[in-house]
Amino acid sequence: TSIGAGVNIAVAQYFGAKKETDIQESISVSYLIAVIASIFLTAACFLAARPVIFGFLQAPEEMRFDSMAYFLIYSGGIIFQLLYNVTYGILRAHGDSRGALIFLMISAALNIVLDCVFISVFHMGVSGAAAATVIAQAGSAIASFLYLRHIFPDLLPKRRYLYAWKGQGALLMRLSIPIMLQTGVNSIGFLILQRLINSFGAPSIEGYAAMLKVEQLAHIPSQSFNVAISSFAGQNIGAEKLDRARRGYRTTILMGVLISISISIVVLLFDRPLLQIFNITGESLRRAKEHLDILMFFIWTSTITNI
């Protein structure tokens, strides 16, 4: 995500300043960084799987096999996540918010549909949930790249621009590191929370996993507004129109909060049927509903943070 955000900021500013060569260089280098980073991250995840799941997270004995399977399958799709995020960032930077939004929504919807198919129809359990996520990410990565190739062929990565990897790579990392640190802190917090949830047993773990899926749907508006404002602000900053960027930011905050509150109300009204889509019942459903109902009262704060 941080690499995609970095290329979005860089390309948007270059686009606003009409620096065509810099646009090509940053795009080409960003894909190179994504491929290299995915190799190292995938290897690190495979090596860390056992100590993280069995040690730090202290997964219950009866769930360790499923936890390992989910983690390893999900880690195998890291390359698709990074490539999709880079392409997504390029589309956003170019001002194609509609195309970027469509692929974001398709990815989320496909993930939910495949979850239902793999879990409810084929009874694949958590392995099916992981496979659904990876397939959705792979489909989005391929489809978005083909879209980029068809609509904006000039924005495709080109080998002759890789010579600029030092300068553009340093810029992309400088833009990505703050977002990377924020994401890292959130991830550490998530791991600590997951460890605490694991201590309450299988019903809490199953309920929390289902709740996260519904939460992802509730977060789509804030992610969409983030898509719009980051590109809008980047292009205007590149064109030295700072007042316009500030007005856009304030308007986006207002719209994002209002829509997030509306979605929270809908989720609170239909929380039980939404959670039952993921085949949870009894105590797992009760705990998921309790967690989701509390979370929905504060989802608007996440919208402000994302924007």
Q: PLM ranges: what are they?
A:
Residues 40-68, 72, 262-289:
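Short membrane-interface helical motifs at transmembrane helix boundaries
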Residues 53-61, 117-124, 184-217, 235, ...:
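Helix-terminus/linker motif at the lipid-water interface of multi-pass membrane proteins
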Residues 1-42, 81-100, 207-271, 305-307:
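Small-residue-rich hydrophobic transmembrane alpha-helices
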Residues 61-84, 216, 282-305:
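Alpha-helical transmembrane segments of multi-pass membrane proteins
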Residues 42, 111-116, 141-145, 217-220, ...:
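Hydrophobic transmembrane alpha-helices of multi-pass small-molecule transporters
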Residues 133, 142-186:
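Interhelical loop/hinge segments that connect adjacent transmembrane helices in multipass membrane
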Residues 34, 74, 100, 104, ...:
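Residue-level signature of transmembrane alpha-helical cores of multipass secondary-active transporters
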Residues 108-142, 271-273, 286:
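Membrane-interface helix-loop junctions in multi-pass transport and translocation proteins
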